[in-house]
Amino acid sequence: MDLKYLNQKEAIAVDQELFNDYKFSVDQLMELAGLSCAHAVAKCFPAEKHPRILVCCGPGNNGGDGLVAARHLALMGYTPTIYYPKPTAKPLFENLSHQCQQMDICDVKECPSVESAARDYDLILDALFGFSFKPPVRADFVAVVELMQQTKLPIASVDIPSGWDVEKGKLTECDVEPALLISLTAPKLCARQFRGEHHYLGGRFVPPALQRKYELNLPVYPGNELCVKL
């Protein structure tokens, strides 16, 4: 059977069942999702060739995934730098930021220019917006989305490429074009428009009964892998 691509309503419903029926905490799922993102990045962009990563984090759970991924990437030998233009004032996100600070992961307060990004980084991790995003992009994030639209650096997007509609995908020809898309839990409808080189599924935590209920038809993760190539 074919892999299912979720619409926005289905993606929200699956998340809510994980929280309410299966009693996962946000912390649990965020840690597993961010760890799987770090593993997918490591498979596609080894630290030997792409050591310096600009991790762009948004205000919601997608941004939290990015903070987790940054921490794990640092442990894997990368040098991540975090750009977090609108930090979330909740204990979970404050703790994730604190963990990164305690690991001496640098952050930048201003969005790099296209030129400075090309000089200072080898890869951008796009963890701005998740499946709850509805256009247009808010003012705080316009500069970083424009950076990703204009840069020649490879981009790895977490779940949804920033600025894309979760169901319709790209809204304009100049939208972000990631080289790696890491779909989490299950791919969303917008992933059908993905034309980059690498598409991975991460978030190896979906209970079999939930997979069957939504007919997700997820691929089998090989061995003890945390992500699987689609």
From Swiss-Prot:
Disulfides per UniProt: none
Binding, (6S)-NADPHX: N61, N62, G63, G64, D65, G130, F131, S132, F133, K134, P135, P136, D159
Species in which this protein is naturally found: Drosophila melanogaster (Fruit fly)
Domain (YjeF N-terminal): residue spans on this chain: 11-218
EC number: 5.1.99.6
One BP annotation, GO: metabolite repair
Annotated coiled-coil segments of the chain: none
Catalysed transformations (reactions): (6R)-NADHX = (6S)-NADHX; (6R)-NADPHX = (6S)-NADPHX
PANTHER family reported for this sequence: NAD(P)H-HYDRATE EPIMERASE
Name this protein carries in UniProt: NAD(P)H-hydrate epimerase
Keywords carried by this UniProt record: Isomerase, Metal-binding, NAD, NADP, Nucleotide-binding, Potassium
InterPro entries membership: YjeF_N_dom, YjeF_N_dom_sf, YJEFN_prot_NAXE-like
Pfam families: YjeF_N
